[in-house]
Each structure stands twice: as structure tokens, then as C-alpha cells.
């Protein structure tokens, strides 16, 4: 039995090498969006697009210098936007994910600065952050492929 152990070990090594070498190659990452993927992305982008359309409410609150409602709007209706944008960003192709994630982070940095401007009751800072937030929002939405 002691003479068979080295032979058995050698056979197991050969079997392991054979099994590993017969493994399938890695799946390639798609470089374009399929129609099914675009449909899926359109479902994910819908609430984000609705939030973008409602940004005019925030602009009106800033114009009225309604500081408490500005903060409430940022933390209320726009509160779930971060998670929705993160989910959408991770659903994009790898080449677009980083840009989408960076724009999403920048947008929420703008919201945080807008919130701080509302606390300080600074209309000029609030207007500036609002304009930049809208630009970031539009740039983010421009990354999302549209159905043809």
C-alpha cells in the first residue's frame, strides 16, 4: 500500500491538470449595448429622468429663497436618487461605468453644497450649485444609451 501512494498522488495530479486545462475560456465583455440591455437601462433611467424634470421645483424654491423647503426637497424627493443612479451606473458597460459613477458623485457633491448654501441662506451660492448640478445631471443622462 505504501508503494501505491506516490503513484496514486501522481495520477491525481495528472487528473487535476487535465480538468483545469479543459476549462472554458473567460467570457468576453460586450463592447456595445444589445437592444435588450437598452430596454433594461430605459427602465432604470425612468425615475432618474423624472427627478431631472422636477429640478425646476428646486429652482423655484431657490428663487423664492425658501431655504427649509430647499433642504427638504434635497433630502426628500431627491433622497433616493443616489441609489437609483448607482444601480444604473453599475448596469452600464464597463467603459461607461467610471464616467457615470464620477458624474453621479459630482452631482451629489453639488446637492451637498446646495444644502450647505441653504443652511447659510446664500442665494448666490445656491444658484451657482443648482446650475452646476443641472449640468452634471444632463451630462449623466447623456451617457445613457437611448433606444433607436
Where are these regions (language model features)?
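Short, low-complexity, Pro/Ser/Thr/Gly-rich segments in the mature regions of secreted, periplasmic
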Residues: 136-148
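Short helix-adjacent coil turns
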Residues: 65-69, 95, 114-128
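Bacterial N-terminal signal peptides that target proteins for export
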Residues: 1-11
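Immediate post-signal-peptide N-terminus of mature secreted/exported proteins
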Residues: 23-72
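Short, solvent-exposed, charged loop/turn and helix-capping segments
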Residues: 81-101, 148
Amino acid at each position: 500500500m505504501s508503494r501505491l501512494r506516490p503513484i496514486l498522488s501522481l495520477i491525481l495530479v495528472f487528473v487535476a491538470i487535465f480538468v483545469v486545462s479543459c476549462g472554458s475560456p473567460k467570457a468576453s465583455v460586450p463592447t456595445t449595448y444589445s437592444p435588450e440591455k437598452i430596454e433594461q437601462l430605459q427602465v432604470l433611467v425612468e425615475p432618474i429622468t423624472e427627478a431631472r424634470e422636477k429640478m425646476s421645483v428646486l429652482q423655484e424654491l431657490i428663487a423664492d429663497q425658501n431655504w427649509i423647503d430647499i433642504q427638504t426637497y434635497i433630502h426628500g424627493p431627491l433622497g433616493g436618487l443616489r441609489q437609483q443612479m448607482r444601480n444604473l451606473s453599475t448596469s452600464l458597460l464597463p467603459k461607461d461605468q467610471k464616467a457615470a459613477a464620477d458624474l453621479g458623485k459630482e452631482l451629489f457633491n453639488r446637492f451637498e453644497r446646495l444644502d450647505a448654501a441653504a443652511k447659510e441662506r446664500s442665494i448666490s451660492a445656491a444658484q451657482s450649485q443648482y446650475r452646476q448640478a443641472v449640468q452634471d445631471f444632463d451630462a449623466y443622462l447623456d451617457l445613457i444609451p437611448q433606444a433607436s
